[in-house]
Amino acid sequence: MRESIVERRTSETDIVLKIGLDRTEPHQITISTGIPFFDHMVQAMSRHGGFDLNITAKGDLEVDSHHTIEDIGIVLGTALQQALGDGRGIKRFGYAIIPMDEALAEAVLDCGGRGYLVFKGTFGNSTVGGIDTSLFEHFFYSLCIHAGITAHIRFSGQNDHHTAEAIFKAFGIALGQAVTIIPESNQIPSTKGTL
């Protein structure tokens, strides 16, 4: 089983995260960050990506949600990197284009060990669900850098809830594809022989 448990404790946050990349039925998803809209987004990402995810996070929400969301990205990225190991047998690449009513999001991923993020699109408002919309890019940046994932995310929409949800679902589906094991493959998906 490709699983990882990562804990992060700082003066700003206390996070325990467990991820399982190999599909189980029913999915084991429990997200508790103290930020209900963010919980909803991460749950959608996990469910549509087909991986188990349990997050318990306590952060300095009396300040704002920045530290909590950033640190969850760091911990999730670290857990993904650990669960993938050397990447032997994975598809490595994944993509998804997901609509949600008027919103459309595209996510293209390479789990090749090089952390990078391109995040293109604009939200109509500065906040959605009580979250500063700039934190979505920051979350995915933190995740990608610590997981060693290159991600290109593009989006458009008029309703920011729909737009955010389409982004998280697209990322989850693309990630689920990229980490899928190719049957009977024991190869590291790189011409270099390493990710």
From Swiss-Prot:
Pfam assignment, any one: IGPD
The protein's annotated pathway: Amino-acid biosynthesis; L-histidine biosynthesis; L-histidine from 5-phospho-alpha-D-ribose 1-diphosphate: step 6/9
Primary residence: cytoplasm
SUPFAM superfamilies with a match to the protein in the record: Ribosomal protein S5 domain 2-like (SSF54211)
UniProt entry keywords in alphabetical sequence: Amino-acid biosynthesis, Cytoplasm, Histidine biosynthesis, Lyase
EC number(s) reported in the record: 4.2.1.19
Reactions listed under catalytic activity: D-erythro-1-(imidazol-4-yl)glycerol 3-phosphate = 3-(imidazol-4-yl)-2-oxopropyl phosphate + H2O
GO molecular function: imidazoleglycerol-phosphate dehydratase activity
InterPro entries hit by this protein: IGPD_sf (IPR038494), ImidazoleglycerolP_deHydtase (IPR000807), ImidazoleglycerP_deHydtase_CS (IPR020565), Ribosomal_Su5_D2-typ_SF (IPR020568)
GO cellular component entries: cytoplasm
Location in or out of the cell: Cytoplasm
UniProt-listed GO biological process terms: L-histidine biosynthetic process
Family of the protein in this entry: Belongs to the imidazoleglycerol-phosphate dehydratase family.
Protein name (Swiss-Prot/TrEMBL): Imidazoleglycerol-phosphate dehydratase
